[in-house]
């Protein structure tokens, strides 16, 4: 195991050096620090420090780019409190828990240890079935609610559960099979459609309130089955401690009401026409998906306008939808096998998720080891092993504190991290190829593409080694890297002025994971042909966002785009991501509008009325003005996909099979 030593300066929440002044307390537990702690800063009486004055001032005047690192966290008192406490927590992780080599690798931006500002695990998928059957209770000193007996009380418990558990985790909280598990309440309460829709409004509005630490909205994901899964079809629901005289498979009409109500509320948006950022809905598209069902029109009307859903590909997939619920059983399989999670990036499989994430700066490796793939791979292995060590330590620390009661609701509803993955990811593979080849070609060239495939396969092999060595689950994720992509580029520019990057001098960034350059094509099928093989290499979550220049013209056109994509390609996850704008007077506007043309026509003498331009920052929609510096640079360079280009593509042909659509 690697030895840990003190750092001379204190890191901020992202680990970069900060001035010194105030001293946070750090006590040593010999079970929770790396071997070698006798040589640590604490043991020698040296303690990491944070400059309290500078920390508050940088936030108040927004001079620190990290104020906008996360587009879900607005400038606010809560944001200031989280930013301030985050620096203290990051100091604890880097100087008290992790070995010195890991802390230095993070500070130097060789890799990025995510969520250092939060003393918590990454993301978690929960069992909605357990919550509904057991109620929201079991924590000493906290209000206890028994199993819900009605739809409205179930909605209340779901909101309370997700909001509460979000405060014990850094990332997304998810429920799967939402429509299946909620359908019995509709029948038992003999609900009308209007009543179901009212409950859906309460659910959605309440899940979009900034109630999370840092004045953030809880990051939530709901997976919808659409039709009852075979493994639940004959099971009789247990509602209010009583077994129902019907099975889940008898409730398709009730499931349809729930799906219809959810989609109508999401499509309507809020009172000013804004999109609901959460919950992110995921739909499992299977081979028997009914593309002509009445609700399908609503699904693609919603998608064409706001682009909200994630579509999980079970048409060309190694997974069965039932694995989303049975994943906790599947995880007992041979650790020599790399397991695919039933989710994109948000832990949507039941009772599993991710303990933590470490992302490797691939662009730097391409620059430092140009023309020498063997040396690049050797250094990649070193960084992956550092990542492994940090994730093993984090697992030990968080599990210890779950047992000790620091995370009371996680202890009640999860208990163990045994079924949670340790996640490693990559960033900037396109720039890696460019630097490795002195800009002779990039990832879109067959040679660059092949290099990326080789390296991703190599990382997968390392995951198997790590699983066998540790007994813990590992996976490879196309990490969202919302702030990391800019941080890597910013740090590399300081250290290596000649390194090739995307963006501009003031807005540099690296292309996410192994994605094609954002300006590569306006044809979504060309992008998928290029991305398919790379996308299938990820075992811990990946998604291909089809960024459209504007609202898709019709539900039928949107449906055809999704159908062709999922039928032709093995890409695990896709989204349709239209660009739209919100005028404070006229609401939703199609496409990008910095100012409102309608307002200008009505009042030509008045000052232009500014609009919010919305698109997906990574996994979720936010106004472009809330993006961090790097993401603004990416948005400026992005060539949006168009319906015209998609329509002129011809048959979409997979490189991995003879399938076409």
Protein language model annotation of sequence segments:
Residues 581-661:
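Intrinsic, low-complexity terminal and presequence regions
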Residues 2-6, 416, 636-639:
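Charged, amphipathic alpha-helical regulatory modules used
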Residues 420, 424-433:
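Extended amphipathic alpha-helical segments enriched in small hydrophobics
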Residues 3-10, 392, 619, 623:
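Non-catalytic alpha-helical coupling and interface elements of nucleotide-dependent molecular machines
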Residues 1-28, 37:
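Mature N-terminal, pre-catalytic/accessory segment of carbohydrate-active enzymes
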Residues 29-418, 439, 445-604, 613:
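Conserved catalytic cores of very large enzyme subunits
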